């Protein structure tokens, strides 16, 4: 029998200067200290878009409308205890100023500098796609 599939939605928030928001996983969490695209698990009955709208509010205190979420690509990666399926969306419009609500560090990063930020194995393949599209 294979690994359980965990569906996580992630968002590349892109500001007016073309920088992407990365969040550093806080101490005590799985993959602590690594940088990632904000997002979270898709709960039962949610679409990935619904999950992102909820997670962006909970984690960053911002409001996103579903039409502002553009699907970019996805990651499919096996960890030792589960298989991660992660659609990545881009968003250039939101309301509010992103603020770390869950103890995470935030950084606005130019796409050509994202490789300097250590990321989970599932996120790393997404960087080339982002550099090409942004």
Predicted features along the sequence, with ranges:
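Conserved N-terminal beta-strand and adjoining loop/helix that marks the start
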Residues: 1-20, 41
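Conserved Nudix-box catalytic region and its N-terminal flanking loop in Nudix hydrolases
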Residues: 19-59
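NUDIX/MutT-family hydrolases
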Residues: 88-90, 98-130
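Active-site-adjacent beta-strand/loop module that shapes the phosphate/pyrophosphate-binding cleft
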Residues: 6, 15, 73-98, 107
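Generic C-terminal helix-cap and adjacent flexible tail
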Residues: 1-3, 131-134
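A short coil-to-beta-strand element that immediately follows conserved catalytic motifs
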Residues: 63-73
């Amino acid at each position: 029998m294979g690994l359980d599939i965990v569906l996580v939605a992630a968002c590349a928030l892109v500001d007016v200067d073309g920088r992407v928001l990365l969040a550093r996983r806080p101490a005590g969490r799985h993959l602590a200290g690594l940088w990632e695209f904000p997002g979270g698990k898709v709960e039962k009955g949610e679409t990935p878009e619904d999950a992102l709208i909820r997670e962006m509010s909970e984690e960053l205190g911002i409001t996103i409308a579903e039409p502002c979420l553009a699907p970019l690509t996805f990651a499919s990666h096996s960890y030792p205890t589960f298989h991660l399926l992660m659609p990545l969306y881009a968003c250039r419009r939101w309301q509010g100023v992103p603020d770390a609500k869950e103890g995470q560090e935030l950084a606005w990063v130019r796409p050509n500098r994202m490789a300097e930020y250590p990321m989970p194995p599932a996120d790393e393949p997404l960087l080339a796609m982002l550099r090409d599209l942004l």
